[in-house]
Amino acid sequence: MIAGGAASRYGGAAKGLLEVGGRRILDRVVASLAEAAGAAPIIIADEPEARAWRRDLEVVPDVLPGHGALGGILTAVETLGPTLCVAWDMPFVPGPLLAALGAGLAGADAVVPESDSPRGVEPLCAAYGPACAAAIRAALARGDDRAVAFHRDVRVARLPRERVLQYGDPAVLFFNVNRPDDLARAEALCRSRASYR
């Protein structure tokens, strides 16, 4: 689970500690990752207080601090090898979707789900293999810390939108809480469907 970035759009607050439907977003993501991987997730974070967020989980600091989510992905693949990466501010990512992404790593270096975003994929809910590490380091050396900056240099497979739709609406699945109005929207989504609780 990547708990990176300064959360500047949320006033610097620890977004994963906010509650949606009576549960912290962090706990929602942990449950989905554990369901998909069959093991306890690891938190990638540079925050000194990160160990207190979930005392039952290991916390690994970024290998290259200050590079946001891409630094978190780098840390995950260099520390863990093949891994599922999910941003800690995405309250509605289901475990079965993550399992499908992980299964795709057999034939690719990265597996990203197609989304409705302008870039067409969601790189902060994806599976990454160790071959991504060198490409991420090269992107960071170029000064490019976008989460997709290294995709052109590795074998990327896409989980087609049709498959993503089997798990729900991509606009909800990949919804992230960046601002107070996003939290209000997440609460409304949670009330609207039992599957989002």
Q: Where are the model-predicted features located?
A:
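Acidic, Mg2+-coordinating catalytic module of metal-dependent nucleases/exonucleases
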Residues: 180-183
